[in-house]
């Protein structure tokens, strides 16, 4: 089967969607499928995977508006790809690609059935920005992406609605995400939808190998770097008095990092040896 994935994020543009698409494409290719990724251009080359080809298209470098320009160029690339090698399924990752209902219908009628993955909605993102502002998160008005979401989410939501109305099936990454789309966009009761929960790579996220000396030395080095290295922590025991709280993600207001930081004094009252480590870009 030839699967064309339209994804606004793909390595080296790492993000939630980019990570999902990278690993999903690799696994689908390993099962014997051919996967073509149509994504936004980037100055660095994407990592190679057997059975996966990457097609880069230009896009307008403006918050929110890029989703529309990228979709238009992705459609051109999809048409060209289909002429060269027939596509069996088109997998669109929403909300980073804004296709109109007319464009969705064209793909369905002239290229292949569409599976739209629902990673989240712009209206939901807007609510996240508003909640962040109410919680006094930092830079809610200074971050151009958050500001654009706050001001234009309603306009761009029509493209998401087009996706769930015109796709052969819509697949959400959680029941809450699916309920969010039903709440905001009110599709027909019989609209074709499903929920597939994303897993994790068990080769990466796994219990520690305590027989691997190099791994244990790295573990000890990290714990000592962040001053959370009592004997229980070094031996992975829950009785540790120096627990590490690890937060990983983009450093934007709607992720709630300032709320987490403000919570630390209360955490330290009960766990004085606790340490908070935040990793991300923003």
Where are these regions (language model features)?
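A conserved mid-protein helix/loop that constitutes part of the nucleotide-sugar donor-binding site
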Residues: 19, 23, 243, 247-266
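Short His-centered aromatic/hydrophobic patch
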Residues: 92-98, 118
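A short, charged, and often flexible helix/loop element on the N-terminal side
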Residues: 52-82, 140-152
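N-terminal subdomain of nucleotide-sugar transferases
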Residues: 1-44, 50-56, 82-85, 110
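Carbohydrate-associated surface elements
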Residues: 41, 176, 199
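Active-site proximal beta-strand in glycosyltransferases
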Residues: 3, 89, 106-143, 171, ...
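Acidic anion/phosphate-binding donor-loop and adjacent secondary structure
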Residues: 182, 200-231
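Membrane-proximal helix-turn-helix segments that form the acceptor-binding/catalytic region
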Residues: 122, 138-170
């Amino acid at each position: 089967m030839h699967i064309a994935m339209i994804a606004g994020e793909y390595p080296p543009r790492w993000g939630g969607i980019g990570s999902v698409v990278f690993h999903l494409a690799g696994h689908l290719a390993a099962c014997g499928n051919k996967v073509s990724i149509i994504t936004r251009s980037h100055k660095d080359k994407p990592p190679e995977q057997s059975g996966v080809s990457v097609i880069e298209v230009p896009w307008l470098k403006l918050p929110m508006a890029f989703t529309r320009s990228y979709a238009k160029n992705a459609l051109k690339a999809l048409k060209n790809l289909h002429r060269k090698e027939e596509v069996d399924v088109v997998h669109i990752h929403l909300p980073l690609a804004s296709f109109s209902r007319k464009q969705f219908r064209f793909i369905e009628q002239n290229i292949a059935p569409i599976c739209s993955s629902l990673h989240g909605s712009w209206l939901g993102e807007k609510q996240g920005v508003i909640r962040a502002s109410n919680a006094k998160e930092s830079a809610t008005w200074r971050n151009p992406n958050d500001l654009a979401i706050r001001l234009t989410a309603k306009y761009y939501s029509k493209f998401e609605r087009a996706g769930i109305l015109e796709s052969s099936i819509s697949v959400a990454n959680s029941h809450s995400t699916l309920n969010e789309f039903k709440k905001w966009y009110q599709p027909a009761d019989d609209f074709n939808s499903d929920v597939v929960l994303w897993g994790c790579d068990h080769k990466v996220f796994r219990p520690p190998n305590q027989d691997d000396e190099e791994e244990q030395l790295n573990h000890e080095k990290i714990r000592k770097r962040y001053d959370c290295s009592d004997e229980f922590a070094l031996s992975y025991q829950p009785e540790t008095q120096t627990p590490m709280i690890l937060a990983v993600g983009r450093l934007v207001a709607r992720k709630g990092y300032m709320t987490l930081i403000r919570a630390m004094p209360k955490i330290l009252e009960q766990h004085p040896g606790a340490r908070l480590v935040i990793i991300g870009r923003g």
